[in-house]
Amino acid sequence: MLVLGIETSCDETGVALYDSSKGLLAHRLYSQVDEHAMYGGVVPEIASRDHLRKLLPLVREVLAAGGVRRTAIGGIAYTAGPGLIGALLVGAAVARSLAWAWSVPAIAVHHMEGHLLAPLLEPEPPEFPFVALLVSGGHTLLVEVRGIGVYQVLGESLDDAAGEAFDKTAKLLGLGYPGGPALARLAEKGRAERFHFPRPMTDRPGLDFSFSGLKTHALNVLAALPGTPQDKADIACAFQAAIVDTLVLKCRRAMRETGLGRLVVAGGVSANQAVRKGLQAMAESERYRVYFPRPEFCTDNGAMIAFAGCWRLRAGQFEPSAIEARARWAMETLTAV
C-alpha cells in the first residue's frame, strides 16, 4: 500500500511517500524557522498561513521525487493532533480534500505516535515490546509500548517539556530561535561543574518529570553574575547536564520497573548529542539496547506520519470525511493495530 503522509502540527511542513513493500520512497520538509525567528518563537497564525502556502507544492514535489502518479496512492495520512489547532486544520483540510478528490481513504495520525514509530524506519528497527522516551518541545513522555496502538503512559512532564525548557532557558541567555540547538552549541564551550542545577523529581519514586524549575534556577544564577559569554556557556552546560541526568535516571528506572530490555528515544530533543551520549552510556552499562531515529527524523517530518498511517490503513482503520484536528489527544485512547 502506498501512503502519502502530511505533517503540519507546528512550524514545519512535511510530506512523504511510504510504500508498505518498498519502504520510504520520498520525503520533503520545509522549515518555517526564518519566518518565526524575528518573533523569538512560533506565531500560530504565521505557521498556519505558511503551511497553506507550501503544502500543495510539496505534495507535487514528493510525487515527482518518488516517481509516482496520484492514481497509485492508496491512502493519505495526516497529523490530527496534538499541536497548534490552526496548523493542524490546514493539514487536515488538504489531506481530506485530496482523499476525496482521489477517492482514497484518509487516516488521522497522532503526532507523538509518529515520533514513537520513527525508529522503525531505520534499517535495524526495534522489536516490540519496548520503553519509549518521547522528548520534544511540547511533550516529555515515558511510554510502555507492547505494539502499535498498545501504549501505557508511565510518566510525563507535569509542567514544561524538556524541549520547552531548552527554548525558554536559551531565551534567558539571549540566544536565537530555535533555542534548543543554540543552547546545545553554547554548552559545548561551558563547564558543567561550575554550577549545580537540581535534578527535578529524581529524589522520589515515580516516572513523572518537571523541568520548569530549571529555567527559574538558570535565571537566578544569571542574575547574580556579570553575564559574560563564559558565564552563559557554563550555565548552558550545567543546565543541559541536569536535563540529561534527569532523563537518564528516569529511563533507567522505567526499564527496571517494566523489565524490558529495549529503549526507543524519539522527538526533537533526541537529536541532542549530549542526550544521546548520556542514554547510550546508560544503556551500555545496564546492557539494554537503545534506538534513535536518524537526526532528520527526530524533528517533525512527514515520513513518520506516512509510516504510522500506513500501518493503520492496512489494518482497515480510517475515518469518514469529517476534518479532524485536536490540540490535545491522549495516546492511551488510540486503537490497537
Swiss-Prot record:
Cofactor notes: Binds 1 Fe(2+) ion per subunit.
GO CC, sorted alphabetically, is:
cytoplasm
One of its Pfam families is TsaD
Cofactors, names only: Fe(2+)
Q: What is its EC number?
A: 2.3.1.234
User: What's any GO biological process attached to this entry?
Assistant: tRNA threonylcarbamoyladenosine modification
Annotated Fe cation binding sites = 111, 115, 300
Q: What is its main location?
A: cytoplasm
InterPro entries, alphabetically? ATPase_NBD, Gcp-like_dom, KAE1/TsaD, TsaD
Could you list this entry's UniProt keywords, alphabetically sorted.
Acyltransferase, Cytoplasm, Iron, Metal-binding, Transferase, tRNA processing
Q: Which EC class heads this enzyme's classification?
A: transferase
**Database matches in CDD domains:** ASKHA_NBD_TsaD_bac
Question: Which cellular compartments is it found in?
Answer: Cytoplasm
Q: Which reaction does it catalyse?
A: L-threonylcarbamoyladenylate + adenosine(37) in tRNA = N(6)-L-threonylcarbamoyladenosine(37) in tRNA + AMP + H(+)
GO molecular function terms attached to this record: iron ion binding; N(6)-L-threonylcarbamoyladenine synthase activity
Residues the record lists as binding substrate? 134-138, 167, 180, 272
Q: Which HAMAP family does this one have?
A: TsaD
* Family as reported in the entry's similarity comment: Belongs to the KAE1 / TsaD family.
Function comment: Required for the formation of a threonylcarbamoyl group on adenosine at position 37 (t(6)A37) in tRNAs that read codons beginning with adenine. Is involved in the transfer of the threonylcarbamoyl moiety of threonylcarbamoyl-AMP (TC-AMP) to the N6 group of A37, together with TsaE and TsaB. TsaD likely plays a direct catalytic role in this reaction.
* Protein's name according to its UniProt entry: tRNA N6-adenosine threonylcarbamoyltransferase
Q: Organism source for this protein?
A: Methylococcus capsulatus (strain ATCC 33009 / NCIMB 11132 / Bath)
| Gene name of the encoded protein | tsaD
